Amino acid sequence: SVSPVTLETVPASDRPFLDHPGPLPFAHRGGAVDQPENTMPAFEAAVGLGYRYLETDAHVTADGVCLAFHDDRLDRVTDRQGVIAELPWSTVREARVDGVEPIPLLEDLLGAFPDARVNIDTKADGSVDAVAEVLRRTGAVDRVCIGSFSDARIARMRDLAGPDLCTSLGPKGVARLRGGSFG
């Protein structure tokens, strides 16, 4: 059986991403309250409110440009349509979230907020290599945590980014954790 865990019993982490004592407040999709989700103004507003932890998702265009964007399609929140993975950056860069804000590059998000921690959900298999490359170029491995609903994507990110990368549990890890609590 698993014993109850309290904040006092959780050991300090050797992961810089987890250097915050207590619960971690995240600005999901940039904390989009007054600004369009996953846009630079949304992230700026969240940081301005004191959030140290941001959350975004990663998708990649047909020509390999890595975006900080939730959906795999432009349709829901932009003034354009189409599957991001099937469109070149030259087309996607014209899309405006809520008709106003451009979709940010993941690299620009990481560069704009060097003191922020960023939880990145790799939403598609094709995003993994591009995210790893962005982390390498920006030197941001120590201030991100990679999440995914795919164990294979998490494993690939660990292989590409190295042992210093913080990752969440994948579905199998969550199942093992939950199963262990019923012993």
Can you name each region flagged by the protein language model?
Residues 2-183:
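Phosphate-group recognition and catalysis centered on beta-loop-alpha active-site segments
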